[in-house]
Amino acid sequence: MRNERNLKHNNNKIDAVFKKLKEEKRKAFIPFISIGDPDIETSFDIAKTLAENGADIIELGFPFSDPMADGKVIQRSYERALKNKISMEDALNFIKRLKTFKDVPVVLFTYYNPVFVMGEKFAEGAEEAGVEGVLVVDLPPEESGEFIKYIEDRNIYQIFLLAPTTDADRMRLVLSYAKGFVYYVSVTGVTGARKSLPETVKSNVTEIKKITNLPVGVGFGISSKEQAKDIAKCSDAIIIGSRIIQFIEDNINDKGLILKKIAEFSKDIRSVL
């Protein structure tokens, strides 16, 4: 059944982005921000700034009150966004609006509860908004059958995480469900910028690539263009969240400076990929 549905759709923009980048011998820059941090309008301007300054795909986090996979920087980002009472409907409208500005592929990063509450209506809303991918942090592939059916019928991919602790059998299972790209978590633990990344990242990504033809993006901990350039040698995409969100936190009362810093950082990262 899953294969039949896969044959129906083959024009997800995530695939097109990676195909084009491969032809150009470049790697994808995938920034992450939280919808509604520090407020809905500023976060929208940040998303636009990223789209204008080299983002190939944008990952947008739906603020959640108990983000188990996220470090302190993203937790605080979600706390700021939650004060603005961002609903899933707000998030989908945000994406729809972003798409009218620039049709950059969007992956919605969420936890399962907000999606579960909406059921199939979530998939309908995501399709209407133009979402290309959904990363549900706490929904493992073997429990996502109904959810995958809802979204794949609408040509939306579920993006899955692989960690350094994922064993070979588990990796094969996850990859059998994966579409678009696979998100390799470079370090054990939670998100957050780090001064150095484990030596095992490259060898682990190489092992993943032996099992799948899907592009592999690396995230968690990348905070500089030097790290990005190094990791890009073995991966197909660089995913950066905490470092970008730190610019928001450090300049919370100066929107112009937030946008300037993020634009400069994005151009810097893009230049080495």
Region locations from a protein language model:
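Alpha/beta catalytic cores of nucleotide-metabolism and tRNA/nucleoside-modifying enzymes
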Residues: 206-212, 223-229, 233-273
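Hydrophobic faces of well-ordered beta-strands that scaffold small-molecule active sites
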Residues: 29-33, 58-60, 106-110, 134-136, ...
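Active-site-adjacent beta->alpha loops and helix N-cap segments on the catalytic face
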Residues: 9-21, 66-74, 86-94, 115-119, ...
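Glycine-rich phosphate-binding active-site loops on the catalytic face of alpha/beta enzymes
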Residues: 57-66, 133-135, 140-143, 184-193, ...
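Conserved, mostly hydrophobic/aromatic
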Residues: 31, 50, 61, 126, ...
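Alpha-helix-loop-beta-strand connector modules within alpha/beta enzyme cores
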Residues: 71-107, 150-159, 163, 200-216, ...
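Catalytic cores of alpha/beta
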Residues: 41-49, 166-176, 218, 222-238
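Conserved N-terminal beta1-alpha1 strand-loop-helix module at the mouth
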Residues: 2-103, 120, 257-261, 267
